Swiss-Prot record:
GO terms for molecular function: kinase activity; protein-phosphocysteine-sugar phosphotransferase activity. This is Mannitol-specific phosphotransferase enzyme IIA component. It is found in: Cytoplasm. The modification Phosphohistidine is found at residue 56. The gene is mtlF.
Amino acid sequence: MSELFSNDNIFLNVNVNSQNEAIEKAGKALVDSGAVTDAYIQVVSTFMGNGLAIPHGTDD
């Protein structure tokens, strides 16, 4: 997991207009770094509850 948490994959003070835009930006960074494929970004769950959306795996 350390390759996912490099300084290149941490973004501070990024302006977005929606949760979806934030997820898209984070997903694009992971795709660009080669950590995941675009297909993965399209199917990953993001809902965590209480207005929080974080890409995460599921049991499916």
